[in-house]
Amino acid sequence: MPKIHKWLKPGWHFLITIMDWLPFESEIAMKSEKLILKYNPAWSGCGRKRSTPSVPKCAEGLFDAKNIIAYATDIPFTSESWSGRIKACRGIEASLTSAEIEKWEAEHKKMLAEYPESFKIPHFITIMDLVKI
């Protein structure tokens, strides 16, 4: 945040958007998380829940919150698009080797075959409009 703060002029805005799937509200999301943890036990991005959003600690003293919006919504996926969404998370593509990713993909595809081709996954969306102090 200090670098972003440095780039912006006083009063300029910085928008943070977070889109977390909710594993405790979706069997598919929960099973996908368990599979990520099987291949990457150190992954810290699991277990997200609905929560009251607040300005990140790293932004305190640098930005004021002009507006914070948070809401839950169901997002439609196909097996392929959900697999892509999960693969893009830092627990898989940013952390595993190519060989591990291939194994994970095969197992995830097999797991998703147990469900309809199209489904919805609940997500918690947070949008923070921060203003440089």
Where are the regions that the model predicts?
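Conserved catalytic/acceptor-binding region of the Class I
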Residues: 5, 9-75
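Conserved Class I S-adenosyl-L-methionine
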Residues: 50-133
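A short SAM/SAH-binding and catalytic strip from SAM-dependent methyltransferases
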Residues: 1
